Amino acid sequence: MSETMLEIKDVHKAFNPGTINEKIALDGVNLTLEKGDFVTVIGGNGAGKSTMLNAIAGVWPIDSGSIRIGDTNVTGLPAFKRAALIGRVFQDPMTGTAATMQIEENMALALRRGKPRSPFKPGVTHKERESFREKLKILDLGLEDRLTAKVGLLSGGQRQALTLLMATLQMPKILLLDEHTAALDPKTAEKVLAATEKVVSKDNLTTLMITHNMKDAIAHGNRLIMMNEGKVILDIRGEEKAKLTVEDLLHKFSSVSGEEFASDKVLLS
């Protein structure tokens, strides 16, 4: 029997409501993710992708509807009370790690986040160090041999891969990836996406990954959703997704929305 890890029901969110600048960001969004679902999210600027992730994380309170993460109704909870349920990686590789601290120190902080700290506990225990080394091997970036290196010495791709790993150390109910490869060059982005697949697959993590690249959205995950004007207009999975091409996706968008997809909104290749 499958386990529901995320349930979004009829969620609405507007910015500047009742003014001439009113913007409907989420317009009745419904989405359910089961344990292990890896869902890629595509859509143009202003489609509602990041607003949806912010609503899940509690950054923006929603106007109506409900959100459940695992068994917890988080609809009215502030972000800090949802933090233990969520792992999140943002677009900027510099924001997820402390540059002046060592790799193992960053990982130790992520592992102990939200837990009571003992003044007698060493910075990083031998057991933690060995665990970190094994986890870093999964990334295949050689970081397992550089545990005491300052994070500021790493490349942007290495830092983003490390941030990804840190976001999963406490086994969150859901992992939110908000265009986490957008600031990287194509070759580095490919490496980070490969690392993402490994980390998500190893721990069977339930994941929502926003991407601005249609090919990446098609190539990764077991489901693809497309958003437009605050709505989920496509939800493609299984064999249909496995056979999907960029041309198919553009055609489906046009059929559902009644308009052509503006190619400047995302990368088609």
Locate each region found by the language model.
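A short, flexible loop at the N-terminus of ABC-type nucleotide-binding domains that lies
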Residues: 2-5, 14-28, 78
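ABC ATPase NBD coupling module
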Residues: 19, 73-87, 95, 118-125, ...
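The feature captures the beta-strand-to-loop junction immediately N-terminal to the Walker
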Residues: 42-44
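Helix-to-loop junction immediately C-terminal to a conserved catalytic motif
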Residues: 57
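Conserved ABC transporter NBD signature motif
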Residues: 65-73, 234-236
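ABC ATPase C-loop
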Residues: 167-168
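H-loop/switch region of ABC-family ATPase nucleotide-binding domains
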Residues: 211-212
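Conserved beta-strand-loop-alpha-helix hinge in the C-terminal portion
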Residues: 231-257
